[in-house]
Amino acid sequence: MANKKEYVVGIDLGTTNSVIAWMKPDSSVEVIPNAEGARTTPSIVAFSKTGEILVGEPAKRQLILNSERTIKSIKRKMGTDYKVKIDDKDYTPQEISAFILKKLKRDAEEYLGGEVKKAVITCPAYFNDAQRQATKEAGIIAGFEVLRIINEPTAAALAYGLDKKGKEEKVLVYDLGGGTFDVSILEIGDGVIQVVATSGNNHLGGDDFDQRIIDWLAEEFKKQHGVDLREDKQALQRLRDAAEKAKIELSSKLETDISLPYITATAEGPLHLEMRLTRSMFESLTRDLVEMTRKPVEQALSDAKLKPEDIDEIILVGGMTRVPMVQKFIKEIFGKDPNRGVNPDEAVAVGAAIQAAILAGEEGAQGKDIVLVDVTPLTLGIEVKGGLFEPIIPRNSTIPIKKSKVFTTAEDGQTEVEVRVYQGERPIAADNILLGSFRLVGIPPAPRGVPQIEVTFDIDSDGIVHVSAKDLGTGKEQSMVVSGRHQLSEDDINKIIEDAKKFEEQDKRRKEEVELKNKADDLAYYIEKSLKEYGDKIPADEKDKLENLVKDLRDAINKNDIPRIKMLFDELDREKTKIGEYIYKQNQQGGNQQAENQ
């Protein structure tokens, strides 16, 4: 029996819907329909009472009757310790996501008549390390060899950017999906797609627009009948489906009728919901949600040091960008219409398929030399003496990237160091987010400042962070992969960046104070060491003076008395030159004495 042909795919694993695509030998990209014949698959998993696992449209169809055993928007929980409990079994977000990926894989294999093994899977640009790891794990559980995890906006730009060879452009990707909003600014040209800035909101998307319609319908119905449909799970699910349908219809129509017969019943009999929703009413219900995308857009422009008029193209991703009010809002900011040449629902999967074909060296990708360059959303570094944050990889650095810095010990005879890894923009480590820590042990005892410890940060092409510390004297090394299960949303990241700006003056002062204390401690250490070595060459009164100054300085450091530290540091700094004078004077006298004796 002949071996089955192997196919390479790109997958958009979305909050609301997922899409799978492949590149044909003629270089065109085809979105693969699922078993139900649709080009998008709802990211929904259900466990039926009989133990059957339903995924996609079948799961969505029975959501009303089985809402407690149906999981949607699991992507929001990726990278956390969240568990779904069904029949005494706990499922991780990776396992639930793997059910979705397995269905995509199975349906693609059926459609293509071969094996689908290798895949590029996308995630939001703002997914942190733990969330990216979880996405990769979901792919592995589903039976894929995950070639790479790439950012959704980067993938969309790739779908768009192939036709733009030879022309340098600044492109803004506005991605408003079912559960997340991402905005990215990219530079495209000469076969390179570089992300220069990213921003967004991890909890803003189509679900929120649906909720506004649900609340409006429920409130209107309550006024008419005195019944709140949101308290009845089945009625609420029917409202949710109707709201989504109405929202979609209002992108092409000015009004839509919502009819839900037998939505509930009272003692008097059954009740029916019949309402008309106009586009203008929908816009007034959701205008503030669209407005919430303004700040991330401005943040991305600010990070890229660009003005709206510097953007050559705006491309839309996510079904929500079909909403006329969203397109009008974008035109108001940029003074130009967004490019509609990319299907917003499929662009990400198409880009992922192109990248997959390039990485796997597929026939259709021959001659397509595309380089994707992603960036780190926040600065990465470690805690150093005095609790300061020492950046190693700055925010918005292109990845993959590897950077090292050499550090030393803070105490005499220190035989181990703790490497504490942080992410953030503040100069004091404790004000940033601790990603994890590890210890490097077995450092040979030596005076402080002598050992050489090289700390290396290595971010791979999936955005996963590897940190290592190496004692350059012994070659001993310790490392870790940052996989702390903390969820850092886009809101959190934007807040971190805003806080850094807000506390800039205060942080600058605190940093200067810590640096002064560190310098004072180093000076006190130097004087003590010098007095030990050369004390016999220094007059007793001068030696006493220096010892008292060191004692007072250490006391001021312990009490955090900044003005006194500064005063004593300056005085001790002036006095330290006398040590050298006395040493050289003694040596000269000794030398002259020797010359006379000869």
From Swiss-Prot:
It comes from the Bacteria. GO terms for molecular function: ATP binding; ATP-dependent protein folding chaperone; unfolded protein binding. The keyword ATP-binding applies. SUPFAM superfamilies: Actin-like ATPase domain, Heat shock protein 70kD (HSP70), C-terminal subdomain, Heat shock protein 70kD (HSP70), peptide-binding domain. The modification Phosphothreonine is found at T180. Coiled coil: none annotated. InterPro entries: ATPase_NBD, Chaperone_DnaK, Heat_shock_70_CS, HSP70_C_sf, HSP70_peptide-bd_sf, Hsp_70_fam. This is Chaperone protein DnaK. The gene is dnaK.
